[in-house]
């Protein structure tokens, strides 16, 4: 695959991960704490805990709001700079950004709607994706099988091509209008295939095989160095990156 190295944080230093380690998640706050002044980071994470309402207007639970505020408070202990926030257009992703910002005490923030953070980013044919979801054991099975095995090519875009469009054409191309630290709140159906891509298939979210799924506020940190090179780190905002 044509993307940069996957790194892991170990004993105070970054190093290239071994394939056996590449299913681990690093605390998002640790990644921020170890970010160099010349680097930028984009945290692409799933929203916090939601209610049973899965539509666009579904809210976070009270616990979900609390978890996001607590993450913000932990981030504030590292630094006081303002973050950029983007969301998918869904209420629960907006509320995740809002509560992280409030938890870190950021007064001046706007939360920008980013269409490319929609959970259907990888979906080529929505009707076929829904049909497979109904026939093959649910969305967690279908989306993880797609991300890790390339299944359902009639329903989903090519993983590498679509991931590069997201990372390079949407995020990197617009990084100049963002801040040093950026939080983009999205959905599990985007995060799981993206984790599959950025870890060369090693991330521990292969629900179809291992019954592991990405946890709330977990996802990928995209770190952009001063020379323009990029590295990716699976990150967690809660105690564990999977559920």
Q: What are the roles of these predicted feature ranges?
A:
Residues 57, 190-191, 196:
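Catalytic toxin/effector domains delivered as secreted proteins or via bacterial secretion systems
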Residues 78-80, 173-179:
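Glycine-rich phosphate-binding loop signature in dinucleotide/nucleotide-binding domains
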Residues 117-134:
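Short alpha-helix plus adjacent loop in nuclease-associated cores
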């Amino acid at each position: 695959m044509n993307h940069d190295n996957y790194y892991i944080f170990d004993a105070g230093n970054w190093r290239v991960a071994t394939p056996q380690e590449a299913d681990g998640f690093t605390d998002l706050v640790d990644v921020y704490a170890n970010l160099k002044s010349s680097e930028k980071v984009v945290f692409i994470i799933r929203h916090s805990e939601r209610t049973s309402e899965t539509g666009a207007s579904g809210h976070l639970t009270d616990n979900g709001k609390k978890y996001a505020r607590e993450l913000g408070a932990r981030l504030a202990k590292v630094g006081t700079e303002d973050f950029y926030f983007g969301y998918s257009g869904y209420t629960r992703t907006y509320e995740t950004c809002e509560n992280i910002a409030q938890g870190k005490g950021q007064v001046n923030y706007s939360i920008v709607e980013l269409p490319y953070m929609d959970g259907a980013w990888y979906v080529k044919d929505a009707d076929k994706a829904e049909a497979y979801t109904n026939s093959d054991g649910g969305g967690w099975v279908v989306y993880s099988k797609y991300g890790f095995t390339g299944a359902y090519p009639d329903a989903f875009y090519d993983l590498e091509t679509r991931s590069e469009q997201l990372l390079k054409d949407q995020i990197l191309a617009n990084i100049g209008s963002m801040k040093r630290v950026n939080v983009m709140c999205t959905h599990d159906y985007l995060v799981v295939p993206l984790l599959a891509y950025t870890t060369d298939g090693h991330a521990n979210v292969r629900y179809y095989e291992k019954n592991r799924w990405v946890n709330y506020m977990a996802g990928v940190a995209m770190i952009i160095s001063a020379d323009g090179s990029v590295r990716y780190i699976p990150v967690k905002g809660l105690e564990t990156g999977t559920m």
